[in-house]
Structure formats: C-alpha cells, structure tokens
C-alpha cells in the first residue's frame, strides 16, 4: 500500500510539473480530459474563477479507484460519480461539492480511507464524503429506513451540501433504475417519492424535485404514467398555441410600461397533474387547460409592477393574490402569485419574481454556494439562514423522538403538509402547517410559551385555543405566571404541528416518569420493611446501582421508574437484592414476615405433614417449600440446609440459586416422593391479553373446567388496552399446571401465559 502511494505521489509530481510547463508554453491554456468537458463547462457558467485542476485530480483518483468496476447498466462505474457531479454543477454547487461528488463512493467501496482523502483533498471534502457515506449504510426494514432518514437530517444540519450530493446521487440512480430488479425499483421509488423528493422541495430544489417525482411515478404506477404522458402529448399543440397568445399579450403590456421582463410558460409535470386529478377529483382537461406563466424581472419593485400590468389586462379572481416576497414560503421561496381570467374565460396562473428569486426557487439552498463565490454571500444569505433554522428544528425533533419511526412520520407530515404564515405581535413571520391553532403557534415561538399558554387573540379578538389560524393572522398568546403550569391533555386532540405534539407528549411523559419514580421508590422500601429485611444493607446507593445494572437499567432512577410503572415488580428487585447482598437467615425471616397468617398456617399444615419431599432419600427430615420460587411436583429441585437445621426446597431456576450455591456445603439432594397423597401446591401464573368485556368471565370458565382452585388474583390494564392478570393456583403437579397454561393460552384475546414466582 505504501509503495503504491509513493508511486502515486511521484506520478502526481510529474503531472504537476508537466502542467506548469504546458501553461508556460501555451499561455496558461491546459488541455483537460475531454470526458470532463461538459462538467467543467457547466461549472464555469456559475463559477468562472473555479480551480478546475482539483476537479481533474478528483476525477483521476475516482477513475483509478473504481477501475474495472461495472454498473448494472454495463457502464464503467466512474460514469456514476461523474453524473452526480454534473447534476451538482447544474444547480450551481461550489467546486468543493463537485470534488466530493466525484469521490463520494471511494471510501465506502474501495480501500481508500478518510485519512487518504483528507491528505489528498483536504478536511472539507473528507467531511462531505464521510457524511454521504454514513447515509449509504442502510440496513433492511422499516425501522432501519427511519433511522437512515434521521441520520440524513443530522448530516444535513451540519452541512446541507451532504444532502445535495445525496439527492444528486439518488437522481442519477433513478435515471438508471431500469437496470435493477422490479422490487428494488419499487422500494427506491417509494422512498424517493415519500421522503427524498419532499426534502428537495423543502430545500427549494424545485427542478430536482419535479424530476424525482416523475421518475418515481413512472416506476410505481407505469400504466397511469403512460396514460398521462399520452394525454399531455395529444393536448400539447393546442395548449402551446393558447400559451403563445397569452405570452405575446403580457409581453406587449410590460413593454408599454417600460418593464424589462422575460415571460415564460410554466411546464406541467406528470406527477403534479396526476396528484391534482386524485386530490381535487377533477378531469385531466380541467387541470391541463389551467395555463400558467412566469414573469422574470430585474428588481422587487418591478415584480409588483408586473402584477399590476397583468391585472390591467385581465380580470383578477378575488382572494387569489399571494405575496411570498414579504413572507417567503419555507423561508426560501419568494414570488408573487395571482390568478386571473384569461382569454376564452379560462383561469390563468401568473407568477412574478426576480431572476435571483427564480434561481433560488429552482435550486433552493444550493444557490447559496453560487452566490458565495460570485456575488458575495448576502444574496442567498437570508434563504440560508431560514433553511438552517428549519434544519435545526428537524435536528431538535430527531433528538426528541425516541422512536425513529415517530420522527419519520413527523418529517413526512411536515414535508407534505401545506403551510400558512402568521405574524407575531412584533411582526415576525411564523410558518405553520395548515389548520394550526394558537397552541401550535405558541410552541413554534418557544416550548415554555407553549406549556404555559392559557389564552390567545387573533387579529385583536379573544378566541378559543382550538381556533384554526389562517395565513396573514396576527396572533398573540397569554401565558400563566405559575411556575408549575403545563399543557392540557385535551390539546393533543387539536394541535397539528409535529413540534407541538412532541412537546406536549414529552411533558406528560416526564410528569408520569416523576410520578412513577416516587411510587417505585416507595414500593421498594415498603416491600423491604414489610419483609423485615435489613434496610441499611439492601437499600443503599451502591446496592441499588448494582441491581439496576444487573437488570439492564441505565441508572437507579430508571429502575425506580420501572417499578412504579409496573414494568418490574418491587418483589423481584428485592429478590435480586437478597441474592446478592442478603443471606439465608434474612431470607427465612423475610418469608415468614411477608406471608399472610392464614396462608402460613395452611402452608405448614401441608408442607410439614406431607410435603412429598425426600431429603437424601429420607422422608424424615423436616423440609419446606421455598416461597421465593414455589416449586411443585415435576419441577427440578434442590435443597438448602437452613440455620435452624431444616431444609428449604428450591427450583433449580430460582432467582436465589446463585447466592445459595456460594455455600455448596449446605446444598443437599432432594427429590419428589412418588405419591403426593392428595397434597396441593401453590403456583403463580401471569397472563397478558387484550382488554375486553367478558375477559375475566372467559378466564374463570377455563379455570373451572380444569378443576383448579384460585387462591389469589390481581390485575391491571395499560394505556394500550393490554390487561395483565396474575393468578395463584393450588395445583397437584407441573402436569396439571401445564394443562392449565395451555387452555389459558387458547382463550380468546390471550397473548401469553407464563409462570412467575410469588413476587417476581
């Protein structure tokens, strides 16, 4: 590897010397690789002073590393990174991005490391390639897809160029998708349509978004796509004639008013036409006949003047004027929109914007790097600031969402929902999803404003908090001064923004966690005290930390919370504390202390007179069944000699087995007598079932049919309607217990039945 690198460095030095010599002999005109001519030509249009030599070097490196690799299409692999870089160049990306695009697959697919990349092309290129590489490591499954999208948002928030390269990568893959198996095509197309294309749209990359949508449409719905294409081709000639008539009329009106402008027809996109047919329920002719034009001017004043000219030529439709210049959509899209009644009584959609606004609309946040190298950063600065604010918001969401799928659902909603803009009392613009309420507005301003919101005014009038906002509304919210103020559970019924939903859900989850933590701590202390166990030895910070780690909880508070929520029983935790820090004398005292008097009498009446246990083959030794694991005939068992001289009998899978076997000299062999002489033994089963009317009746019927007595029962139901029921039965052996478990599992709505200890 080192010899190859030294050879590479030597050849690079020769090439560099040759290049300098060529410049001196040819007046600084260097002959480039003809394969790169289209890429370099496009790049120079946006960045005339760009250093093209680094692009040549990047291409040479990528070509060498991918040498011999063939794509599914049969083309050399180098055609893919070259195409990705060309797409990035077409939207005006900077030289660094193009270098990263050329090299974006080298680290993942070859032995070229990030260190090599940093050494050869610098840290910035390496960071971009690393970001793209991490996005490409996609596992299978829905959860993996959601986690990948989450990673994409994190990478994008750190440097949006990572997403630009990823989108360009996806666009070229979609263009060549026909060479993949149909199922892979469908999977990629659906992800593109649901996430990648909306992300491109949200970042203002309209031209890329349209193509991604149409390519996905062709793969997912080929028959519908072909029909739309045919209809468009059939209607195109008459539509083009009508459009030319309008453009000529508008151009003439602008010229008469001394407004220098370019008037263009707006193209119709196949997926957009299909969506309007589905969503609006309208015929193809109605949608396709809706003609649109775009007026491009030199400055903002002429945008408004151009709309004035259009309104003088045609009758404006009421309520259809939208000013996205003073209140940009998504923080990046700026334009004036209006709809008028055109020739022949057909609606005409008109947009007016400056040339810079048009470029921003087509290429979005990517335009920032064009301005950065040509006009200074100020032209695209506000768009970048607003877009970065949106990406920071997404970053907050992904941190707050414990479940990646929850984050993906929120992202999909935010990307696909229509937006409104409202104003704060100070005149600041706040973008919200359509149907948002004052509560959504409050959370958009600040989390604490949302939590403490108690009232609102819209346009100076007091309104209910569930009132729906409209674009242009001026919103003022009133907050409580109470430090403990919080949201209402009822808000979850009407808020629509992902941020508001997440913040409200988190608040109640935190409130529940605190309640569970206190309840869990109290429950554990109560079990220890009730059992007469040494509090000073068991209930310490170090002992609790040990048990929390053993039970796979991150800390002691998490363990207390789990006890309080019912995820684990306090008795089970005490059993583990005893196994690690207690001794047999503590255990015996605890069993007596926590056993009800009536049960203790019944237990002694059976176990001491006829436990059915042979100790070392003899029935004469006093033995009693351990309450910690409740063995019944048929269980594998062992004996442990107590300090009082008796023998406690445990199941071999008892939770205390590890602690007891630390004193092997006290372990004795025990076995079940062949005849139990009619004795019964306690066994506890826990079942989980869908909560429904008649569940307990059904379970009772099954138990009665098995002729088994119930000595204790308790139950609780979770928020997701899962009922957990615990029964203690008097059974003769494991055979009867197993039959009972089978019949309970077969009961309608029962998910699972399993055996537990008396407290575990």
Swiss-Prot record:
Segments traversing the membrane: none
Reactions listed under catalytic activity: GTP + ATP = guanosine 3'-diphosphate 5'-triphosphate + AMP
GO biological process, one term: guanosine tetraphosphate biosynthetic process
Pathway(s) the chain acts in: Purine metabolism; ppGpp biosynthesis; ppGpp from GTP: step 1/2
GO molecular-function terms, A-Z: ATP binding; GTP binding; GTP diphosphokinase activity; kinase activity
One family name in Pfam for this protein: HD_4
Residues in TGS domain copies: 418-479
Keywords, ordered alphabetically: ATP-binding, GTP-binding, Kinase, Nucleotide-binding, Transferase
Domain ACT: 684-758
Annotated ranges, domain HD: 77-174
EC id: 2.7.6.5
One GO CC term, this protein: plasma membrane
Family: Belongs to the RelA/SpoT family.
PANTHER family according to UniProt: GTP PYROPHOSPHOKINASE (PTHR21262:SF31), GUANOSINE-3',5'-BIS DIPHOSPHATE 3'-PYROPHOSPHOHYDROLASE (PTHR21262)
General function of this protein: In eubacteria ppGpp (guanosine 3'-diphosphate 5'-diphosphate) is a mediator of the stringent response that coordinates a variety of cellular activities in response to changes in nutritional abundance. This enzyme catalyzes the formation of pppGpp which is then hydrolyzed to form ppGpp. It also has (p)ppGpp-degrading activities.
Name of the protein this chain belongs to: GTP pyrophosphokinase
């Amino acid at each position: 590897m080192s010899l190859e690198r030294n050879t590479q460095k030597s050849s690079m030095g020769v090439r560099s010397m040759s290049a300098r010599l060529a410049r001196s002999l040819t007046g600084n005109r260097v002959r480039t690789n003809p394969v790169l001519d289209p890429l370099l030509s496009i790049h120079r249009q946006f960045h005339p002073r760009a250093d093209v030599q680094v692009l040549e070097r990047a291409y040479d490196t990528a070509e060498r590393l991918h040498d011999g690799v063939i794509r599914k299409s049969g083309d050399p692999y180098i055609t893919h990174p070259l195409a990705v870089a060309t797409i990035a160049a077409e939207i005006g990306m900077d030289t660094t991005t193009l270098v990263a695009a050329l090299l974006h697959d080298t680290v993942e697919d070859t032995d070229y490391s990030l260190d090599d990349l940093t050494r050869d092309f610098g840290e910035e290129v390496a960071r971009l390639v690393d970001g793209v590489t991490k996005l490409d490591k996609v596992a299978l499954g829905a959860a993996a897809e959601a986690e990948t999208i989450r990673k994409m948002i994190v990478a994008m928030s750190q440097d949006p160029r990572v997403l630009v390269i990823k989108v360009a990568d996806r666009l070229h893959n979609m263009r060549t998708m026909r060479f993949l198996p149909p199922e892979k095509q469908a999977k990629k197309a659906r992800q593109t349509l649901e996430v990648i294309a909306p992300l491109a749209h949200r970042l203002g990359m309209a031209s890329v978004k349209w193509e991604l949508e149409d390519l996905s449409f062709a793969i997912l719905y080929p028959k519908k796509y072909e029909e739309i294409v045919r209809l468009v081709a059939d209607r195109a000639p008459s539509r083009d004639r009508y459009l030319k008539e309008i453009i000529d009329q508008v151009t003439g009106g602008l010229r008469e008013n001394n407004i220098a402008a370019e008037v263009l027809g707006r193209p119709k996109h196949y997926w957009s036409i299909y969506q309007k047919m589905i969503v609006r329920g309208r015929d193809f002719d109605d949608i396709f006949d809706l003609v649109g034009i775009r007026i491009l001017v030199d400055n903002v004043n002429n945008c408004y003047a151009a709309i004035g000219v259009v309104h003088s030529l045609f009758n404006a439709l009421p309520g259809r004027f939208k000013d996205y210049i003073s209140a940009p959509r998504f923080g990046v899209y700026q334009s004036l929109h209006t709809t008028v009644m055109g020739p022949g009584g057909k609606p005409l959609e008109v947009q007016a914007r400056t040339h810079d606004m048009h470029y921003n609309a087509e290429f979005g946040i990517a335009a920032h790097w064009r301005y950065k190298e040509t006009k200074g950063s100020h032209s695209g600065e506000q768009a970048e600031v607003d877009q970065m604010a949106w990406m920071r918001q997404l970053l907050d969401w992904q941190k707050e969402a414990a479940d990646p799928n929850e984050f993906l659902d929120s992202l999909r909603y935010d990307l696909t929902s229509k937006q409104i803009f409202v104003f704060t009392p100070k005149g600041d613009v706040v973008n919200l999803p359509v149907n948002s309420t004052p509560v959504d507005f409050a959370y958009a301003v600040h989390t604490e404003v949302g939590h403490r919101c108690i009232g609102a005014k819209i346009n100076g009038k007091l309104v209910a908090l569930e009132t729906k906002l409209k674009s242009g509304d001026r919103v003022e919210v009133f907050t409580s001064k109470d430090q403990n103020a919080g949201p209402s559970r009822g808000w979850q019924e009407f808020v629509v923004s992902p941020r508001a939903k997440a913040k409200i859900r988190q608040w109640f989850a935190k409130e529940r966690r605190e309640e569970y933590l206190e309840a869990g701590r109290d429950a554990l202390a109560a079990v220890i005290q009730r059992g007469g166990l040494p509090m000073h030895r068991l209930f310490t910070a170090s002992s609790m930390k040990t048990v929390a780690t053993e039970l796979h909880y991150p800390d002691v508070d998490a363990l207390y919370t789990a006890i309080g929520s019912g995820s684990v029983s306090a008795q089970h935790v005490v059993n583990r504390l005893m196994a690690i820090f207690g001794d047999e004398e503590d255990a015996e005292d605890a069993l007596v202390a926590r056993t009800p008097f009536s049960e203790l009498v019944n237990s002694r009446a059976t176990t001491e007179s006829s436990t059915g246990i042979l100790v070392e083959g003899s029935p004469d030794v006093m033995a009693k069944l351990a309450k910690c694991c409740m063995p019944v005939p048929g269980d594998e068992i062992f004996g442990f000699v107590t300090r009082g001289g008796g023998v406690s009998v445990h199941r071999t899978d008892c939770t205390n087995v590890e602690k007891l076997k630390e004193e092997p000299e006290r372990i004795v062999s025990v076995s079940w007598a062949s005849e139990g002489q009619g004795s019964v033994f306690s066994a506890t089963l826990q079942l989980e079932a869908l909560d429904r009317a008649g569940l307990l009746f059904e379970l009772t019927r099954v138990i009665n049919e098995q002729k088994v007595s119930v000595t204790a029962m308790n139950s609780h139901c979770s928020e997701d309607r899962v009922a957990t029921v615990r029964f203690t039965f008097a059974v003769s052996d494991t055979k009867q217990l197993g039959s009972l478990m089978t019949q309970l599992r077969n009961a309608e709505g029962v998910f699972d039945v399993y055996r537990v200890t008396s407290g575990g």
